[in-house]
Amino acid sequence: MNISENTHIVSAFGPQAGGSAIAGDYINLKNASHVTVLVEVAQGNATTVALTLEQATAVAGTGSKAITEAVPIYLVADADTSDVWVRQTNAVSYTTSAALKTKLVAFDVDVDTLDTNNGFDCLCVKAAASNAANILAAQYIVTGERYHNV
């Protein structure tokens, strides 16, 4: 599989300190079937990082609300020494441990889990404020697009 031809990768937010809350850009999933929200946490302080997903009716964040249907979550607890993904309990959010490790967290979201009946087809990842020594970055990896949204 050629990742650049079979997926659409979009930056949610670039690397930044977690001393303040971080909100990723909203992505329109109207013509997609699935998105993996990938968050990298370089944890430099023993403060947990709370991650959430919100849905909206437009990429401006119109009517934003938390997702309500639990989605599969995967974790690499120490990405500096391992590349093994471990399935976590399905949930609508995830909070990291306080361990000083580089972590990868993936939310697997089928677009059907969004409130599409009420027009919610946009998604955003958010990180609550933790500590400035915690550096975070996130991407959306979209699959199953009928055609690319611009």
Question: Where does each model-flagged region fall?
Answer:
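Surface-exposed, low-hydrophobicity beta-strand/loop segments enriched in small/polar/acidic residues
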Residues: 1-150
